[in-house]
């Protein structure tokens, strides 16, 4: 059974108490991912994620890195097509320190020009790393082929050209548009006291205010019969196939998940047994 409540500013809080866990995980989920970007904004969700781990009004970049290490905790973030998540895992007694740090990243980031330029270089290297990792690159090509001109077709990292030319002002504007209390979920799992959690949420997130309304992405049905190839000087060919599936609220979601597991979910799956075990044609195959 989960505890759920909403702050006056719209931040939603959902928590699950797990008594046999000595630790607690906490995440701030923002409805900002690459599917919410325009073509000119491509890569900004991920760029913002990087920038929020730079200096804040209360912490230096190093202090952010050291704070969780000092108590044996973990802190990190990721950007997806649908969202960006900032999360931490700590011993239960340090829950407030985790909420304090994550809320400081979210609300207190300085977004300095010097940090912006340094992080631009880091992300350009990350894009180059993806280009050198064909098992990652092939998924970007698959999305490009399947979704065509829709925002879902664009890479989460952005392109080299886009990141090399984007301005700090564009990043600040994107953050202002999408990082809003009514577009945020605070999720907690592990040991916590509900009354204390409500006080923490109000103390660290309750005063947050934002203006404007982010643009919602247009639904996409995908394309038909598209394919993309990219020639690389490597030893193997990496290939992906995509077909229309079902929505997350569709009654067929769970039957399809079971079917997917039978088809390519493990060593006993049909794909693995046929392509690897019987044919010896590939090392890795899955769905």
Model-derived segments and spans:
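A common structural microfeature
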Residues: 12, 23-25, 44, 48, ...
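N- or domain-start disorder-to-order transition segments that initiate the globular core
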Residues: 1-23
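Histidine-centered active-site/metal-ligand motif
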Residues: 46, 50, 150, 238
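Short proline/glycine- and acidic-rich turn/helix-capping motifs at secondary-structure junctions
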Residues: 216-225
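A generic structural signal for well-ordered coil/turn residues at beta-strand boundaries
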Residues: 1, 22-24, 82, 223-224, ...
């Amino acid at each position: 059974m989960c505890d759920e409540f909403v702050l006056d500013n719209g931040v939603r809080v959902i928590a699950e108490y797990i008594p046999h866990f000595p630790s607690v995980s906490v995440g701030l989920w923002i409805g900002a991912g690459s599917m919410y970007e325009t073509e000119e904004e491509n890569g900004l969700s991920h760029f913002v994620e990087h920038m929020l781990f730079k200096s804040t009004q209360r912490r230096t970049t190093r202090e952010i890195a050291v704070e969780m290490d000092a108590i044996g905790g973990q802190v990190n973030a990721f950007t997806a097509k649908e969202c960006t998540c900032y999360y931490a895992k700590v011993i239960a007694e340090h829950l407030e320190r985790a909420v304090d740090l994550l809320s400081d990243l979210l609300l207190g980031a300085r977004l300095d020009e010097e940090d912006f330029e340094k992080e631009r270089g880091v992300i350009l290297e990350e894009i180059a790393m993806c280009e050198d990792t064909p098992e990652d690159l092939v998924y970007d090509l698959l999305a490009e082929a399947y979704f065509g001109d829709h925002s879902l077709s664009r890479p989460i990292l952005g392109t080299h050209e886009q990141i090399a030319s984007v301005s700090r002002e564009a990043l600040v504007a994107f953050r202002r548009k999408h990082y809003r209390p009514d577009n945020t979920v605070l999720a907690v799992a592990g040991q916590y006291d509900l009354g204390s959690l409500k006080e923490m949420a109000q103390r660290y997130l309750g005063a947050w205010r934002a203006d404007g309304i982010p643009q919602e992405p247009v639904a996409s049905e995908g394309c038909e019969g598209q394919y993309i190839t990219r020639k690389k000087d490597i030893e193997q060919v990496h290939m992906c196939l995509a077909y229309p599936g079902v929505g997350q609220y569709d009654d067929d979601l769970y039957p399809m998940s079971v079917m997917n597991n039978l088809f390519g979910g493990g060593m006993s799956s049909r794909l693995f047994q046929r392509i690897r075990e019987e044919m010896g044609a590939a090392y890795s195959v899955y769905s």
